[in-house]
């Protein structure tokens, strides 16, 4: 297989090695601040385009063209770069591809950031609010400690899909160019895909494209979370362990597996997003807790339907369980992807 055709749904030892190296780099290094991240440049491009185009009339049309052109342009750019390098050195192309996979995966940093939120809460509520503001889009200045923990775990579940499973899904379908194109789509949604006065027209297509790109990965993520939860014994959902209970034994939900599936099917589509509710419902089923409620975004109040019926206090062990389960789910996804490439 020629590596420059790796945007096609084909496999081989090259893609197996590329994916494994990229994943190991993320596992060990996370997102090092000393390496410029491609998403930074995507963000600058989006900010530039939004400033130039999001004014006057026909904002929805201009936003649609901008989103589609940005995504296709990213795919073509990465494919062209890899094709150019392949003509000179397949080994160098593999190295560049592995680096881009590394940049597209965010599992290590996601788990680290969520853990830091819970650790910050031990120092004080204001510290927790500031820390969670790094990973959520909602206004955090008035959140309670319980709302800070809930926001962190909701983000963990949602971004396991956006930051790990979905990039892997598009890598399996369209190789490194597809993975990078997905990151552009996801970055567009995170920057302009809001239903407020400024973005509701210009960012409409960006939000819909992201919904389509994440439709299957979000449901795969939910299933992987539930499968990963099998490794944890049951515990009482009435636990009152304090946030600092890092030495408490780890345990899972009181719900048997078939009840978790029923929980997922009941609450997966309750979210305002067609996708975010599925991984969130899966994690809520594992923890036997409740997500959702009223949140403020850019000073405007939004209501998210509740996911779950058990409004118990979340604690430090819930974070530990969630991080481990999300890592196991990520590991399953990596193994499945490697098997696909190695066997084709």
Annotate each PLM feature.
Residues 2-180, 185, 193-344:
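Hydrophobic alpha-helical transmembrane segments
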Residues 190:
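RNA/tRNA-interacting regions in translation and RNA-turnover enzymes
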């Amino acid at each position: 297989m020629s590596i420059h055709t790796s945007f096609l749904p084909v496999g081989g030892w090259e893609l197996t090695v590329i994916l494994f190296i990229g994943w190991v780099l993320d596992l060990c290094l996370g997102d090092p601040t000393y390496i410029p991240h491609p998403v930074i440049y995507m963000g600058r491009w989006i900010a530039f385009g939004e400033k130039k185009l999001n004014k006057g009339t026909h904002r929805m049309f201009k936003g649609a063209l901008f989103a589609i052109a940005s995504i296709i342009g990213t795919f073509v750019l990465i494919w062209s770069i890899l094709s150019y390098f392949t003509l000179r050195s397949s080994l160098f192309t593999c190295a560049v591809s592995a680096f881009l996979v590394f940049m597209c995966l965010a599992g290590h940093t996601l788990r680290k950031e969520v853990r830091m939120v819970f650790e910050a809460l031990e120092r004080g509520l204001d510290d927790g609010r500031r820390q969670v503001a790094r990973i959520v889009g909602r206004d955090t200045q008035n959140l309670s400690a319980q709302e800070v923990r809930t926001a962190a775990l909701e983000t963990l579940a949602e971004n396991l899909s956006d930051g790990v499973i979905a990039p892997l899904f598009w890598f399996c379908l369209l190789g490194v160019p597809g993975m990078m194109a997905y990151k552009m789509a996801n970055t567009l949604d995170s920057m302009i895909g809001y239903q407020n006065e400024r973005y509701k027209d210009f960012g409409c297509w960006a939000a819909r494209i992201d919904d389509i790109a994440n439709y299957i990965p979000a449901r795969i993520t939910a299933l992987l979370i539930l499968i990963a939860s099998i490794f944890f014994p049951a515990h009482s959902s009435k636990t009152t362990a304090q946030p600092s209970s890092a030495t408490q034994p780890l345990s899972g939900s009181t719900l048997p597996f078939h009840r978790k599936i029923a929980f997922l099917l009941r609450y997966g589509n309750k979210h305002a997003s067609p996708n975010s509710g599925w991984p969130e419902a899966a994690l809520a089923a594992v923890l036997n807790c409740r997500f959702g409620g009223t949140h403020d975004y850019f000073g405007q109040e939004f209501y998210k339907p509740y996911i779950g019926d058990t409004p118990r206090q979340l604690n430090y062990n819930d974070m530990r369980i969630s991080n481990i389960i999300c890592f196991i789910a990520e590991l399953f996804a990596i193994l499945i992807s490697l098997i696909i490439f190695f066997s084709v």
